[in-house]
């Protein structure tokens, strides 16, 4: 099975390649960064490069598109680059995949495409998204690319799987989510300040995300699927578990206890369609961070 991965040097990309190697897939990686692992076919190239199609073999089974300008702060500072990379780069890959008859296009989207969550409501893939409630250039760029993929699928493009990733955490040294950041502060400081301890997300470990990508291989038609954690974990949950794991007690302060922010995207469809659900609970996930914080 021939698998192409854009953003192969990213946090998710490296974890995905590690999993794929155990499954004996034929891997081709694209990234603008220099390679850290020479043990697979790699091309240092920008996804906007019109010549990228030359490195895609004919009739590849899956193209997994992870590459993006993904930090929201970067997207706000550089909105033109954000849409150039995330939208035009994706269109260039769609064209390239079409020319080379790729069988399935898997697109890494995000739970941030969902607008406001009111009173911890659960949203699913059929929920109406009001772009007037969006203040994230990153989320808008992902929504535009999702729409472009739907349009191209309707025009005869290959099978399309859009995976809306939840808030991902895992063993890494930078670009932390709230999970890694809090765990590091509990480990290295005696005091931590958060907005509201009741703020919560359905955090999901990177290894569960990559397993979800693999589980979606071969999915027919056009599909949008959330890959999120099984339950909402609050900042208090993370702090309490971190203290338990590290056998340490710290002072916890709230700067805005009444400003509770909860995002609750369902993962029920993933269980139904691809038989996926997270396996890494928060305690095990936090323990995996110890060497990195």
Region roles according to the model:
Residues 186-293:
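C-terminal substrate-binding subdomain of Rossmann-fold SDR/epimerase-dehydratase oxidoreductases
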Residues 47-85:
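NAD(P)H-binding glycine-rich loop region in Rossmannoid oxidoreductase-like domains
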Residues 68, 83-90, 106-109, 141-142:
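Short alpha-helix in the Rossmann-fold core of NAD(P)-dependent oxidoreductases
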Residues 36-50:
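Rossmann-fold cofactor-recognition segment
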Residues 9, 117-120, 143, 147-201, ...:
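NAD(P)-dependent short-chain dehydrogenase/reductase
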Residues 81-83, 134-143, 176-180, 202-203, ...:
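Short-chain dehydrogenase/reductase
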Residues 3-23:
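N-terminal Rossmann NAD(P)H-binding glycine-rich loop of SDR-like oxidoreductase domains
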Residues 91-137:
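Conserved Rossmann-fold NAD(P)-dependent oxidoreductase catalytic core, especially the SDR/UDP-sugar
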């Amino acid at each position: 099975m021939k698998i192409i991965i854009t953003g192969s040097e990213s946090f998710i990309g490296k974890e995905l390649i590690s999993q794929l190697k155990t499954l004996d897939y034929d891997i081709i990686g694209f990234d603008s960064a220099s390679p850290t692992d020479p043990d697979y076919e790699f091309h240092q190239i920008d996804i906007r490069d019109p010549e990228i199609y030359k490195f895609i073999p004919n009739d590849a089974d899956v193209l997994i598109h992870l590459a993006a300008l993904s930090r929201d702060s970067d997207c706000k500072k550089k909105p033109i680059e954000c849409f150039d990379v995330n939208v035009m780069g994706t269109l260039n890959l769609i064209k390239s995949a079409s020319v080379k008859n790729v069988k399935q296009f898997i697109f890494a989207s995000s739970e941030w495409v969902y607008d406001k969550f009111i009173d911890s409501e659960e949203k699913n893939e059929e929920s109406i998204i009001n772009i007037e409630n969006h203040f994230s250039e990153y989320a808008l760029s992902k929504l535009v690319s999702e729409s472009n993929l739907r349009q191209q699928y309707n025009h005869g493009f290959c099978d399309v799987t859009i995976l809306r990733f939840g808030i991902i955490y895992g063993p890494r040294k930078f670009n932390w989510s709230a999970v890694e950041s809090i765990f590091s502060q509990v480990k290295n400081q005696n005091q931590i300040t958060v907005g509201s301890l009741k703020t919560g997300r359905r955090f999901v470990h990177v290894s569960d995300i990559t397993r979800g990508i693999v589980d979606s291989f071969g999915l027919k038609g056009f599909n949008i699927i959330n890959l999120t954690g099984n339950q909402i974990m609050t900042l208090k949950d993370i702090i309490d578990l971190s203290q338990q794991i590290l056998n340490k007690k710290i002072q916890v302060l709230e700067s805005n206890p009444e400003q509770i922010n909860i995002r609750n995207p369902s993962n029920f469809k993933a269980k139904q369609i691809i038989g996926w659900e997270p396996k890494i609970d928060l305690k095990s996930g936090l323990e995996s961070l110890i060497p990195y914080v």
